[in-house]
């Protein structure tokens, strides 16, 4: 009987959602389980979608103390990829993001607010094109748990809109902003 109670107790402890514990994670870019995507208007007629292929980062997450959560990301702006080599060369040029001069963009969170139902506001400082501005990312907790290889993972999605003029990036045509969509899966350190 005692063994049965202990076994049941251990099983219940293991069934408690993984995310209930505070943990530090590295963003899984090696396994391609994270992406930084963008969408920008093309002449007001359609949209160009793309991504940054090279980035790294980490985050801390505690479902019981959301305010203690933190995020740090570094993006190689030279890795911008819209699936069109000539356009990418132009976007990376001094006409837009000037990736030769400003080859990294960084985001460092300053505050994380719990909005309920797994939704979060992640506020922080984005440095892009040599300019640092506060932004807010509307994020959502996707899930957490053990992976098939014995590690622990946690995932989030997020969106934000960046006004190009805020970062001294020239506006061309009708689009004064770029929408960002973030998919983040972290592996527990």
From Swiss-Prot:
Residues 1-22 form the signal peptide. Coiled coil: none annotated. Gene3D superfamilies: Lipid/polyisoprenoid-binding, YceI-like. It is found in: Periplasm. GO terms for cellular component: periplasmic space. Keywords: Periplasm, Signal. InterPro entries: Lipid/polyisoprenoid-bd_YceI, TTHA0802/YceI-like_sf, UPF0312/YceI. SUPFAM superfamilies: YceI-like. Belongs to the UPF0312 family. Type 1 subfamily. This is UPF0312 protein VVA0736. The lineage of its organism: Bacteria, Pseudomonadati, Pseudomonadota, Gammaproteobacteria, Vibrionales.
């Amino acid at each position: 009987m005692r063994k049965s109670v202990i076994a049941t107790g251990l099983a219940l402890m293991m069934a408690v959602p993984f995310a209930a514990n505070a943990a530090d994670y590295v963003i899984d870019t090696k396994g391609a389980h994270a992406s930084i995507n963008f969408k920008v208007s093309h002449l007001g007629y359609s949209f160009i979608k793309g991504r940054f292929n090279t980035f790294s980062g980490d985050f801390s997450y505690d479902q019981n103390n959301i305010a203690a959560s933190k995020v740090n990301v570094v993006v190689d702006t030279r890795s911008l990829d819209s699936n069109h080599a000539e356009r990418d060369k132009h976007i990376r040029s001094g006409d837009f993001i000037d990736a030769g001069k400003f080859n990294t963009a960084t985001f460092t969170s300053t505050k994380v607010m719990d909005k309920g139902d797994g939704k979060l506001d992640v506020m922080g400082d984005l440095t892009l094109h040599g300019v640092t501005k506060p932004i807010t990312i509307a994020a959502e907790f996707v899930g957490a748990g053990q992976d098939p290889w014995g590690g622990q993972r946690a995932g989030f999605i997020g969106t934000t809109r960046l006004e190009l003029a805020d970062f001294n990036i020239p506006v061309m045509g009708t689009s004064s902003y770029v929408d960002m969509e973030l998919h983040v899966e972290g592996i527990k350190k």
